[in-house]
Amino acid sequence: MSNSVDTQSLMLQMRSLAAEAASQSQSVQKVEKGAQSAENFSDLLSQSVNAVATEQNKSSAMKTAFEKGEDVDLTEVMVQAQKASLSFQAMTQVRNKLVEAYKDIKNMPI
C-alpha cells in the first residue's frame, strides 16, 4: 500500500516538473517573440515616419509644380496637401501617446 502512494507521489512530482519545464520553455519563447516584436515595432515606426516624409515631399513637389504653372490640377494639389497634413497630425498624436505612456511607466512605483 505504501508502494502505491510512493508511485502516485512520484507521478505527481514528475507531472509538476514537466509542467514547470513546459512553462519555462514557453516563457523563453515569449521573450524571444518579444524581442522580435520590438524589432518589428521599430521597423514599423520607421516605415511610418518615412511614409509621412514621403507624403510631405510629394505635397511640396506638387505645390511647387503648380506654382511654376506646370500641368498639375489644383484639386490634386489640395488633396495631396490634406493627405500630408493628416498623416503628419496622426504621427504627432502617436508620438504624444508614446511619450505619455513612457512618462506613465517612468512614474510607476516599484
UniProtKB/Swiss-Prot annotation:
Keywords assigned: Bacterial flagellum
A Gene Ontology BP annotation from the UniProt entry: bacterial-type flagellum-dependent cell motility
Entry keyword Metal-binding: no
UniProt-annotated location(s): Bacterial flagellum basal body
Lineage: superkingdom: Bacteria
GO cellular component entries: bacterial-type flagellum basal body
MF annotations from Gene Ontology: cytoskeletal motor activity; structural molecule activity
PANTHER family in alphabetical order: FLAGELLAR HOOK-BASAL BODY COMPLEX PROTEIN FLIE, PTHR34653
Family note: Belongs to the FliE family.
Name of the protein in question: Flagellar hook-basal body complex protein FliE
Species the sequence originates in: Hydrogenovibrio crunogenus (strain DSM 25203 / XCL-2)
Lineage of origin: Bacteria, Pseudomonadati, Pseudomonadota, Gammaproteobacteria, Thiotrichales
